Amino acid sequence: MTQIINKDEVQETSSKKLTIKTANSIDQAQFELRKITERTSGTVQDEAIKVVDDILKNVRERGDEALTEYTSRFDGFLTEKFQVSSDLILKAWEETPRELQDSLLLAKKRIEKFHSLQVPKNITYTGPNGETLGRRWSPVEKAGIYVPGGRAAYPSTVLMNAIPAYVAGVNQIIMVSPANSQGEINQTVLAAAHITGINKIFRLGGAQAICALASGTESIPKVDVITGPGNIYVTLAKKKVYGKVGIDSLAGPSEILIIADQSAKLEHVASDMLAQSEHDPLASAILITTNTKLAEKLPAEINRQLINHPRLKICQESISNWGLIVLCDDLETCAQLSDTFAPEHLELLVEDPKKLSESINNAGAIFMGPWSPEAIGDYLGGPNHTLPTSGTARFAGALGVETFMKNTSLIDFSKEAFNENKNAVVQLANSEGLHSHAESIRIRDSKSF
């Protein structure tokens, strides 16, 4: 059975049960999951593409002049100086309450430790005829980090993007983030930047910030890789500049899928779903469960926890439009449905989460058991919280140190190795009709050096 939580029902009292929509087959459940995956496609995106195209064209042609105009129009303040001074960044850190400083430092320590384990190793191989082959990793020169503003401040985004770049050995880490109408970036965001090795910070947001990083302007350095989440305009801008620069991913609205059995606690499931829904009206929270009572009681518990919620409207819109409950006969079916959806975040609130996790192939991150809520991973678990969304966990993974690195192949053939392999190369080149490829082998074969 599939239960979709409707907006009007969320606003009713918790004593009234929400209507349950029954799915006649697994196919019906998969259909509902596909609708969630595709929730950002359509007319809105088409209109946004036109806006982004205009912004990219203007920034490329007019540089800082265009940035000034867009900042005034979209962010509400007028400036020709986008860079945040080092004094302001230090001041933000010094004025951060000690307890929050300690929390930021703890998160930094844990994230840095985990990501230091990801640094790829160079490899060297000596072939049978003395040829030396290798693969060498090196960091990009400059990385651009986008930190969103808007509905909330995200110092965790600073940590999760800047620390992997720092660990990778990136020479210059450039951060952009939209300021408020007074031209100020959130103080905790600046405090997080202070401790993560960021070299420069610019008060700049939206598609215009992405274009500035990709192309460079009079004041904004051109970078090699751009990472960080944003709204639909930021995401489309990243899509447009990809190929000119590297990017981490095309992030869609956030999502969580929870698989729960008889051992799951109702209040845990509800709170974890709301923790996802409070991000954004387009965020999605899904429960797939074998527990009939949990499925029946969850709407009322969500309603109860929404009482006096500071982000009530966002949660209601998210849950009502993109919340989903699926009741299954067994955990194997739950896992199969989860793999079909390929969630960004997957929580396993089951009796044996490690065993169930072994049957999961498609998930950005898996949170196992009652003591590993998604919020742990969002802030300081260690693994990165920048994860594939909208079904892309089928082929993509989390942001990591390698996002800010590239590899170079090394080939050093000896004369003996050349002679041993030359005939095969000529045959292969001829089969492709590439005369000069074959000739580059023959000419060496005929010369003595």
UniProtKB/Swiss-Prot annotation:
Binding site for Zn(2+): Q276, H279, D378, H437
InterPro entries recorded: Ald_DH/histidinol_DH (IPR016161), Histidinol_DH_CS (IPR001692), Histidinol_DH_monofunct (IPR022695), Hstdl_DH (IPR012131)
NCBIfam families: hisD
Coiled coil: none
EC assignment: 1.1.1.23
Cofactor note (record): Binds 1 zinc ion per subunit.
UniProt xrefs under PROSITE patterns: HISOL_DEHYDROGENASE (PS00611)
Cellular component, GO annotation: cytosol
Pfam families, sorted: Histidinol_dh
Cofactor(s) it depends on: Zn(2+)
Catalytic class of the enzyme: oxidoreductase
Top-level taxonomy: Bacteria, Bacillati, Cyanobacteriota, Cyanophyceae, Synechococcales
Entry protein name: Histidinol dehydrogenase
Reaction catalysis annotation: L-histidinol + 2 NAD(+) + H2O = L-histidine + 2 NADH + 3 H(+)
Gene3D superfamilies: 1.20.5.1300, Nitrogenase molybdenum iron protein domain (3.40.50.1980)
Binding-site list for substrate: S254, Q276, H279, H345, D378, E432, H437
Gene Ontology MF terms in the entry: histidinol dehydrogenase activity; NAD binding; zinc ion binding
Pathway assigned to this chain's UniProt record: Amino-acid biosynthesis; L-histidine biosynthesis; L-histidine from 5-phospho-alpha-D-ribose 1-diphosphate: step 9/9
Active-site positions on this chain: E344, H345
Keywords per UniProt: Amino-acid biosynthesis, Histidine biosynthesis, Metal-binding, NAD, Oxidoreductase, Zinc
GO BP term (any one): L-histidine biosynthetic process
Gene: hisD
Residues that, per the record, bind NAD(+): Y146, Q208, N231
Family as reported in the entry's similarity comment: Belongs to the histidinol dehydrogenase family.
Protein task: Catalyzes the sequential NAD-dependent oxidations of L-histidinol to L-histidinaldehyde and then to L-histidine.
